[in-house]
Amino acid sequence: MQWETVIGLEIHAQLATQSKIFSGSSTAFGAAPNTQASLVDLAMPGTLPVLNEEAVRMACLFGLAIDARIDRQNVFARKNYFYPDLPKGYQTSQMDHPIVGKGHLDITLEDGTTKRIGITRAHLEEDAGKSLHEDFQGMSGIDLNRAGTPLLEIVSEPDIRSAKEAVAYVKAIHALVRYLGICDGNMAEGSLRCDCNVSVRPKGQAEFGTRAEIKNVNSFRFIEKAINHEIQRQIELIEDGGKVVQETRLYDPNKDETRSMRGKEEANDYRYFPCPDLLPVVIEPEYLAKLREQLPELPVQKRERFESQYGLSAYDASVLSASREMADYFEKVQGICGDAKLAANWVMVELGSLLNKDGLEIEQSPVSAEQLGGMILRIKDNTISGKLAKMVFEAMANGEGSADQIIEAKGLKQVTDSGAIEKMLDEVLAANAEQVEQYRAADEAKRGKMFGFFVGQAMKASKGKANPQQVNELLKKKLEA
């Protein structure tokens, strides 16, 4: 039997506000436990929440960016459940009247095609605290620094059909919230977490299968692996005569498996009711109109502009627009050197390799956009060859100065004097007279391979400084003379 996978994702984006959603406590990451928890966060009797307007603004920005309906009046609700790191015994969230209604996001698949994923809703809520197990023998500690941190929960329609599509969607959301400046997207610190709802059904069947929810997956790689494992688990279970149970599961990256955590709750299990401590939030059309003017160029728009303005391929434009910082860096380099394709190649290949090796983000690059743009200018004006440029790039990454300073200090200036190159080539050919005779006696197919030998000898003799194009042209003339 052929199976179809159905996936819906719930992404929790931690909003980049300076203070919590209902209190004035700081949201800075990494503070000592319980140093950023106010009386409101501790749920002390008599304290009342005050809504953070910045969180509302950020949620509305997101809604505008996904072309969603934004409710003029939205209501906060209490989601009732007990957990040690939830001091109030309920979480303030939104249920029937979320701030952001139906919208959509287009994702680019591996084959270059575009797919539209529906977004059911996005609502504001507060995060819970954190249970700490490692440092307490036989006990658990509670850190309430995170309690009350504003979250935007983004719920997709069940439109996703594979683990790779799921990753593409999460990457698109990740890029979008970073472009908007509403979330730093740091998955390692928990700023962006994903719950994956996975089910399978026989191909052609309209009715959904029973879903399992994989909680709190925090990397693109783990999302793909967790979903693939869960798909396989469900198919094997059904084919062996079993039934999929609606439940919450956890992904264990060390064992590459999901395991049951608890039975999956439904909305009525949480006994939602409107929060009596918070008034409904009214969002006027004039407010949204002003916000719309603040929207930056979004990832899809930037990618399309890179293709049309700079003539980049769809793939290159997609990579370079993946983050706002990467796009800004590329445009600075291009603005200096005036060659978009050369700039794209150096940013994606050489710089990308350096950043990946050292685990750095583009904003932490040891080579500035000004330095890289200046170096590419020296390639264009034939001061250095592409091969020598790699040496210059490495030196810039090591903090040895600008391209011009390094070229001068290391004597890397390319030899472009035709007379000097001809003299050097004569010496190379004289030293390899036997190979010259073999070349002249060979057919075209063999000559192609042998020509590379002479080029290599010439570049070796010039210590890589001879202009490769001139070497090729002059060498061909001499060998065929």
From Swiss-Prot:
Annotated InterPro entries: Asn/Gln-tRNA_amidoTrfase_suB/E, Asn/Gln-tRNA_Trfase_suB/E_cat, Asn/Gln_amidotransferase, Asn/Gln_tRNA_amidoTrase-B-like, GatB, GatB_C_1, GatB_Yqey_C_2, Gln-tRNA_amidoTrfase_suB_CS
The keyword Cell membrane belongs to this UniProt entry's keyword annotation: no
GO biological process, one term: translation
Gene3D superfamilies the UniProt entry points to: 1.10.10.410, GatB domain, N-terminal subdomain
Molecular function via GO: asparaginyl-tRNA synthase (glutamine-hydrolyzing) activity; ATP binding; glutaminyl-tRNA synthase (glutamine-hydrolyzing) activity
Any single Pfam family the record assigns to this protein: GatB_N
Reactions listed under catalytic activity: L-glutamyl-tRNA(Gln) + L-glutamine + ATP + H2O = L-glutaminyl-tRNA(Gln) + L-glutamate + ADP + phosphate + H(+); L-aspartyl-tRNA(Asn) + L-glutamine + ATP + H2O = L-asparaginyl-tRNA(Asn) + L-glutamate + ADP + phosphate + 2 H(+)
EC number: 6.3.5.-
Lineage: superkingdom: Bacteria
Keyword field: ATP-binding, Ligase, Nucleotide-binding, Protein biosynthesis
Broad EC category: ligase
SMART domains referenced in this protein's UniProt entry, alphabetically: GatB_Yqey
Entry-linked NCBIfam families: gatB (TIGR00133), PRK05477.1-2 (NF004012), PRK05477.1-4 (NF004014), PRK05477.1-5 (NF004015)
Quaternary data: Heterotrimer of A, B and C subunits.
Family: Belongs to the GatB/GatE family. GatB subfamily.
Job description of the protein: Allows the formation of correctly charged Asn-tRNA(Asn) or Gln-tRNA(Gln) through the transamidation of misacylated Asp-tRNA(Asn) or Glu-tRNA(Gln) in organisms which lack either or both of asparaginyl-tRNA or glutaminyl-tRNA synthetases. The reaction takes place in the presence of glutamine and ATP through an activated phospho-Asp-tRNA(Asn) or phospho-Glu-tRNA(Gln).
Protein's name according to its UniProt entry: Aspartyl/glutamyl-tRNA(Asn/Gln) amidotransferase subunit B
Native source organism of the sequence: Pseudomonas aeruginosa (strain ATCC 15692 / DSM 22644 / CIP 104116 / JCM 14847 / LMG 12228 / 1C / PRS 101 / PAO1)
Gene that encodes it: gatB
